[in-house]
């Protein structure tokens, strides 16, 4: 049917011309509408019937497509006379759809959809009156027209399922008017939210970029638990057939029942990394989605090592992966290995060959690459011959690269016959030399999912094209078939996560190792001081959608700052010390001051610092010639000392004769309560200890260091010379007891974490993130 004819027919359903043209671009909806029009025949499609057919066509899933004529008939006969009834019919048919050619109980269908049920205006009025009287009258009298009447509507619809929503809303409005009368001037004013009122007892909340993102993104949440419970809507265990694209066979119903009997109806997920590198920030999203979804639904999550590439796997990667999963706060239900199933996978490969669904092929690896590789000349090789050759592959009788086992299936993107097994004469870290044939990802992944009764196989979007082979393989073997769900990958700007390229950075001595704090591996983020909670919250803010996400590091840092702001105790540190001698020091000897760890919440703990006549402030907190708006110490401007109760003023400036640099200030002090209030207070230390402080910035200059258009010279040419600097800082002695990975806020500077290079006599700190910039701070 020509495009113009279809547009005209779509308009006859009740669409605008623009809507009809947009619909034509959707091949699936167009197909459903064409079939619907054919099924409707000469029936009159007016009074909204046509748009109900359109609604059905957009919602119809492949599992229920066979029932399209039935749905059209019920719509045309006005048995399904609103979208609510159409949706109920689709849901009911989907439940029946796990069996092929399922016989539909029409009486049950009509009951489920409320066919013939008429809710009269009198019923609606009586129900609304009863609900308001029983549950809402007091609140209405108190809040008047500011009350959210949607609560009443939901309550009434819960009792009168098939009542027309507009009629219910109208009845509610009438009852509220009868109760309250006309709106007053106060009713017309916007309501002040409770959380808008200032609270003296609590500091003003800081709105961070991360918080803004979480608020703005409807698919995000503040925590993983909230995200998985409120924003993610996957199928229930055992209802795999409801998922889009799920393939139903004559065995599906039986297999799902057996699956539910084994799992007890619990959610089963898995996190299946390859143990050939260190996990990075993108993996953190995968960990949170898989473990988080299971935890939110009282399920279990496996940690499964996809160890099918023996030449790339190392023991240190196995250990590091487990360590990072646990660091993020998750405990695997079981730790498994794809190699645990090598024997079963081999036996299933033999089954495929016997069914004529797999064959031994001798095309070289380079012949299989590209968009249109030549079809295999061995595709129709006799089953007995493939069985014999596959056994020869297993016994090491065929050279590496001389043969593969391929599956007879075409993937979604058109790729034909993916490889299931290849020959590798390499010892495996777990199975030793037992095997010289190893299964591929395409073959292994879905079968291990099936063996572990995974309910939700959650993976990134690039695996969507493998979904067809995933379902095909499970169904070809007649085993339980999980559901694969894809979500968008998380990418970080100004960063690299490629294992090969990070290894290059290490060998070129640009970074020190996989845990260099300038990287975005999880070990690096931990070393830099990022709390696991912050990484988890950041992943929650990103949501679970099909869109690929690329964010700046500042967004992750904002989530880190949110957590550290309430968990990192404060300490006084100066990075570039300037000596200050208080000539009228008000005490005969050094004094101990008790300082709160969290000034805004003193009840959370305190620590002691020493105040003596010689202190050190930041060099940047003194200026000989201050510019306009400068607020800190200057020859004619005093400054307060944080926590000391003193205000100091400059009396004398001591300079290095050789360089002219200021090396000491001689100051006088006044008690803060007697002095004129200074414009600023600065941090200081006295009788300090020394720290090595490593200050980190972005490693790369450009947002996409791998993009040849942005960085023609390659990522190695894009390294920032200022990505790391080291200073010797002075700190109060309370930091003497700090342990590796302890986190602190150095007041007015930023958040810092104790580095593993720390020893008994040498404290090393990494800057985690700076403080939020305060506009106008001078």
Curated annotation (Swiss-Prot):
InterPro entries: aa-tRNA-synth_I_CS, Gln-tRNA-synth, Gln-tRNA-synth_Ib_RNA-bd_2, Gln-tRNA-synth_Ib_RNA-bd_N, Gln-tRNA-synth_Ib_RNA-bd_N_1, Gln-tRNA-synth_Ib_RNA-bd_N_2, Gln/Glu-tRNA_Ligase, Glu/Gln-tRNA-synth
UniProt cross-references to PROSITE patterns, sorted A to Z: AA_TRNA_LIGASE_I (PS00178)
Species name: Drosophila melanogaster
Motif ('KMSKS' region): 496-500
Underlying gene: GlnRS
Gene3D superfamilies in the cross-refs: 1.10.10.2420, Glutaminyl-tRNA synthetase, non-specific RNA binding region part 1, domain 1, HUPs, Ribosomal Protein L25, Chain P
EC number(s) on file: 6.1.1.18
Name this polypeptide is given: Probable glutamine--tRNA ligase
Residue numbers covered by motif 'HIGH' region: 273-283
NCBIfam families in UniProt: glnS
Single annotated GO MF: ATP binding
Stretches for region Disordered: 188-219
Coiled coil, from the record: none
